[in-house]
C-alpha cells in the first residue's frame, strides 16, 4: 500500500468513526450494562473479550516479524508499548472478569473487525511507511516521545485501576449495580474510559502519527457516547447520589 492509499484509508476510517460517534448517541451498544436480547446470540463475556482483542495482538506481531525495521530501538519500543496494552486486554483482563455475563456475537464481531483494521493501521505506519529518518535514536529525547509516554502509561494505569474498582463493587453472587466511588470515579462515572482515552492520546503523541490520531478519534467516538449513556443510567438508578460527576472528562463533560 502506497502512502497516498494509506492516507485515503485513514480518511475513510475517520469518516466511519464520525458516523459511529453520532450513532452511539442514539443506539446503545448492547454489551455490559446495556445488553438486551434484541442483540441476538451471545457468548461468555470472558471468551468474547479474548476473541475480540487477540486479533490486534496477533496482527501487530505478524507485521513486526516481517518488517526489516523490527529491531530498530524506537520501532521496537513502540511495538512493546502497544503489545503491553493488548496482552493485558486480550489475555489478562478477560480472566479477571467476574460473574456470568455474556456479550452478543454481533458486538464481538464488530470489535474483531475494528481491531484487525486498527492493527493494520498502526503496524503499517510504524513498521513500513514511516520515513526511515523519522524514528531514530534521538526520538527518545524528543518532547513527543517523553510527553506521549508519560500520558500513555498514566492512562494505562488509570484504566487498570478503574477496572479493578469496578470488578470489586460486588460480592460473589451479587447481581445488583453499584455507583463506583473511589479513584477517578469521584469525578466521572466512566473513569476507565477516561484512562483509555488518555492512554491513546499518549500513543498518538509519542508516535506523532496520523494513524495514532485516527485511533484516538475512534476511541473517543466509541467511548464518549457510551459514557454519556452510563451517566444517564446512573442518574436513573442512583439519583442525587451521582452528584456533580461528569461523564468522562473531569470537570468538563
Mark where each language-model region is.
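Membrane-helix and juxtamembrane interface regions of eukaryotic multi-pass membrane proteins
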Residues: 1-87, 92-110
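Context-gated lysine
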Residues: 28, 46, 98-102, 124, ...
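Juxtamembrane interfacial secondary-structure elements that flank transmembrane helices
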Residues: 22-34, 87-91, 100, 125-130, ...
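Active-site pocket-lining segments that scaffold enzyme catalytic pockets across diverse folds
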Residues: 106-125
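Hydrophobic transmembrane alpha-helices
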Residues: 2-22, 61-71, 107, 114, ...
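Glycine- and acidic-residue-rich phosphate-binding/metal-coordinating active-site segment common to enzymes
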Residues: 131-135
Amino acid at each position: 500500500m502506497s502512502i497516498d492509499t494509506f492516507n485515503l484509508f485513514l480518511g475513510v476510517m475517520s469518516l466511519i468513526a464520525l458516523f459511529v460517534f453520532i450513532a452511539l448517541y442514539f443506539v446503545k451498544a448492547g454489551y455490559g450494562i446495556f445488553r438486551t436480547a434484541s442483540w441476538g446470540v451471545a457468548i461468555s463475556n470472558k471468551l468474547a473479550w479474548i476473541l475480540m482483542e487477540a486479533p490486534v495482538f496477533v496482527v501487530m506481531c505478524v507485521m513486526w516479524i516481517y518488517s526489516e525495521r523490527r529491531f530498530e530501538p524506537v520501532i521496537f519500543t513502540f511495538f512493546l508499548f502497544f503489545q503491553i496494552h493488548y496482552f493485558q486486554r486480550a489475555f489478562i483482563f478477560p480472566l479477571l472478569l467476574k460473574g456470568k455475563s455474556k456479550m452478543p456475537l454481533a458486538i464481538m464481531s464488530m470489535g474483531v473487525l475494528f481491531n484487525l483494521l486498527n492493527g493494520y493501521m498502526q503496524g503499517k505506519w510504524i513498521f513500513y511507511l514511516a520515513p526511515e529518518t523519522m524514528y531514530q535514536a534521538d526520538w527518545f529525547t524528543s518532547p513527543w516521545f517523553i510527553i506521549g509516554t508519560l500520558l500513555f502509561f498514566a492512562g494505562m494505569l488509570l484504566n487498570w485501576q478503574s477496572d479493578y474498582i469496578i470488578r470489586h463493587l460486588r460480592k460473589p453472587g451479587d447481581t445488583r449495580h453499584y455507583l463506583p466511588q473511589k479513584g477517578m470515579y469521584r469525578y466521572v462515572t466512566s473513569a476507565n474510559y477516561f484512562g483509555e482515552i488518555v492512554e491513546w492520546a499518549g500513543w498518538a503523541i509519542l508516535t506523532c502519527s496520523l494513524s495514532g490520531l485516527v485511533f484516538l478519534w475512534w476511541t473517543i467516538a466509541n467511548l464518549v457516547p457510551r459514557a454519556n449513556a452510563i451517566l444517564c443510567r446512573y442518574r436513573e438508578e442512583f439519583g442525587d447520589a451521582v452528584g456533580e460527576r461528569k461523564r468522562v472528562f473531569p470537570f468538563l463533560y
